[in-house]
Amino acid sequence: MAGHSKWHNIRHKKAKMDAKRGQMFTKIIREITVAARQGGGDPEFNPRLRIAIEKAKKANMPVENIERAIKRGTGELEGVSYEEVVYEGYGPEGVAIIVECLTDNRNRTTGEVRHIFTKHGGNLGSSGCVSFLFEEKGVILVPKDKYDEETVFEKAIEAGAEDVITDDEEFYEIRTEPKELYTVKENLEKEGIEIEKAELTRIPTTTVEINDEETATKLMKLLDALEDNDDVQKVYSNFEMSQQLMEKVS
């Protein structure tokens, strides 16, 4: 298994997030608010907001919560102003970690993220220390039980995608240039392709293999602690781990 935010891990992630629905709502609301602030409150003309709203609906977030978050972003309602901050650091065995945050207090978040790294055997680095080990991509997941590989590949390339990865048992992973994600998604939907998830992500270009249970346990505790922080939106890392070991330490 490669990387903590790789799609192979979606079942583990879903179970974890279902158990923390309130925290998940908080993170999605922040994303909606920031998206609306940056690109306006109309999802028709704001692809980032459109994706965030779709995520909220899939999580069964009440419509009024979504509408309030949009209005806070556009300034129609008073609300907290969030800043996007990215942290970079290292975990056990030199695993590279990127942490994307939305925060109303950068100093607080920096202190908390630094503490989590230190507590779990990692260390917070400087900006740029590991980001060169990742590529930013758009990723679209399409369920494998609905379509054959040839159909998905053909539709994806026609829609403007770069590639289709077929390693996962449940999903085809369609990759795009970051700026093309929303266009490719819309083109696929026009062709009747069902999409499980569409998101901007960071994909590791080099990986660190983790084989022993002790290191794997430390690493997963670090990554989980980061994700459990309210200010953290996404965590990326470049580890490789067998499915068996992942299940054992998750």
From Swiss-Prot:
GO BP, sorted A to Z: regulation of DNA-templated transcription
InterPro entries the UniProt entry points to: Integrase-like_N (IPR017856), TACO1_YebC-like_2nd/3rd_dom (IPR048300), TACO1_YebC_N (IPR049083), Transcrip_reg_TACO1-like (IPR002876), Transcrip_reg_TACO1-like_dom3 (IPR026564), YebC-like (IPR029072)
The keyword Protein transport appears for this protein: no
Transmembrane regions: none
UniProt keywords, alphabetically: Cytoplasm, DNA-binding, Transcription, Transcription regulation
GO molecular function terms noted in the UniProt entry: DNA binding
Domain of life (superkingdom): Bacteria
Gene Ontology annotations for the cellular component aspect, listed alphabetically: cytosol
Cell compartments where the protein resides: Cytoplasm
NCBIfam families membership: PRK00110.1 (NF001030), PRK12378.1 (NF009044), YebC/PmpR family DNA-binding transcriptional regulator (TIGR01033)
Recorded family membership: Belongs to the TACO1 family.
Protein name per Swiss-Prot or TrEMBL: Probable transcriptional regulatory protein PERMA_0079
Organism of provenance: Persephonella marina (strain DSM 14350 / EX-H1)
Lineage of the organism: Bacteria, Pseudomonadati, Aquificota, Aquificia, Aquificales
